[in-house]
Design a protein with these regions (language model features):
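Flexible, small-/acidic-enriched active-site or ligand-binding loops
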Residues: 228
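Charge-rich, well-structured scaffold segments of protease-associated domains
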Residues: 3, 8, 19, 63-215, ...
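Short glycine/proline-enriched turns and hinge-like loops at secondary-structure junctions
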Residues: 42, 254-256
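M16/MPP (pitrilysin/insulinase) zinc-metallopeptidase core fold and M16-derived inactive scaffolds
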Residues: 22, 27-91, 264-283, 294
Length: 419
């Protein structure tokens, strides 16, 4: 039987865990309450750059030493940066807990940010930016976000820009680390065959030297959304389209309705958009709907990739499906089938210790209630057909922002999209 526990240490650090004694693995994450939205204009991409630098050595371990240490543990080691948090995580066999945690702690507390390592890693991140820009089905989301939220930090790319990343020096890293990498801004989340009391004891030992503090509370700016057509002309084989509208912020009480609506429209192979645009007409390979909720702001969008000559027809079909669902064309069977899908995927995902760890760490870092899977499935099953229809009408009435990367000019696209 699994058990969830939480402890706040004297230095402000939070330790939260879910014990699953029926497995041998442990997934452990160090979650820092800092993301790209917390950067000043002169720090664009610095949060993500710092994530890279944490792997580049401490006074006692070089980057190869760190990699070899986790290899010897038979462990997975990685990290990621989002708009609202940064996470360093490892997955390992349960008897390697102290060996893994001690080095993770050393990485985030004692990284030395040598100028040689910074010079090399700047080039690595610039290559990462180039890879993203060369992937139009990825980069079209950046175009959409930057155009839809032009004066909001959630509209800016997590990776930053070449110019800013190319300018970072030792002092920038030291100052950013001192400002954000303190105990009050850190949640240690673990799931698997782990004892909570042992985890707390180890956290006290290995994070004793970390600067204490209180959790940072970010100032939430009022979002100003822009609508219209935003395009980038490229010599490519497909038109990559994102059609989006302002949406619910993180933790909104209507989030269960929103997920059901999104799934009906474009969340599976039986969804409206997949069936109508791909299966019946063969106009796309990839089409789906998604939502992104952040503190104080949210976005909802549809992505489609199609032959440029099909752009107008795909846009027509997207609007047609939005209109249909808003006009009461949802059966009780379709509603229940999609709710079953959501609940089933939720429960299947929680068989992984990593999924449990991410769930714990993300919700604690963002100040969300630690709801149980049972509470979530109950929330989805309480959604009614009328609630879905009402939300669909709101979605349809919102002014969209449409981002397109294609061989067409802005003028040509305007005729196709709005003509």
């Amino acid at each position: 039987m699994s058990q969830q526990c939480k402890t706040v240490l004297d230095n402000g650090m939070t330790v939260i865990s879910r014990t699953k004694p029926d497995v041998r693995s442990v997934s452990l994450g160090l979650w820092f309450n800092v993301g790209s939205r917390d950067e000043r204009p002169d720090q664009a991409g610095l949060t993500h750059f710092m994530e890279h630098m944490m792997f580049k050595g401490t006074p006692t371990k070089g980057p190869l030493d760190i990699s070899m240490h986790f290899d010897r543990l038979g462990a997975e080691l990685n990290a990621f940066t989002s708009k609202e948090y940064t996470c360093y995580y490892a997955r390992f066999v349960d008897d390697k807990l102290e060996d893994a945690l001690s080095v993770l702690a050393e990485m985030v507390i004692e990284s030395n940010f040598s100028q040689d390592a910074i010079d090399t890693e700047r080039e690595v991140v610039i290559e990462e930016i180039a890879r993203s820009e060369d992937t139009p089905d990825d980069y079209v989301y950046e175009l959409y976000s930057q155009s839809n939220l032009p004066n909001h930090p959630c509209g800016l790319p997590v990776l930053g820009t070449r110019d800013r990343v190319g300018s970072y020096r030792h002092a920038d890293c030291v100052d950013f680390h001192a400002e954000h990498y303190h105990a009050g801004n850190l949640t240690l989340a673990a799931a698997g065959n782990v004892d909570h009391d042992q985890l707390v004891t180890l956290a006290k030992r290995y994070f004793a030297s970390m600067k204490p503090g209180k959790k940072e509370h970010r100032k939430l700016l009022q979002p100003q959304f822009s609508s219209g057509l935003f395009s980038q002309k490229r010599d490519i084989e497909q038109a990559h389209i994102v059609y989006g509208v302002p949406w619910l912020p993180l933790g909104n009480e209507r989030r269960y309705i929103a997920t059901v609506l999104t799934t009906i429209l474009g969340g599976s192979m039986s969804s409206r958009l997949f069936q109508e645009v791909r299966e019946k007409r063969g106009l796309v390979y990839s089409i789906y709907a998604m939502q992104a909720g952040y503190q104080g702001v949210g976005q909802w969008c549809i992505y489609a990739g199609t032959r440029p000559s099909n752009t107008q027809e795909v846009m027509r079909l997207i609007r047609s499906e939005l209109d249909a669902i808003a006009q009461d064309y949802v059966s009780e069977d379709e509603l229940s089938r999609n709710i079953d899908l959501i609940c089933g995927q939720l429960l299947l995902g929680l068989e992984s210790t990593n999924s449990h760890m991410v769930r714990l760490g993300k919700r604690e870092t963002l100040g969300l209630e630690q709801t149980t899977p049972e509470q979530q499935t109950e929330g989805y099953r309480s959604v009614t057909k009328q609630q879905v229809l009402d939300m669909a009408q709101e979605l349809l009435s919102a002014e969209p922002a449409i981002a397109v990367i294609s061989p067409y000019s802005q003028e040509e696209l305007s005729d196709l999209v709005f003509g």
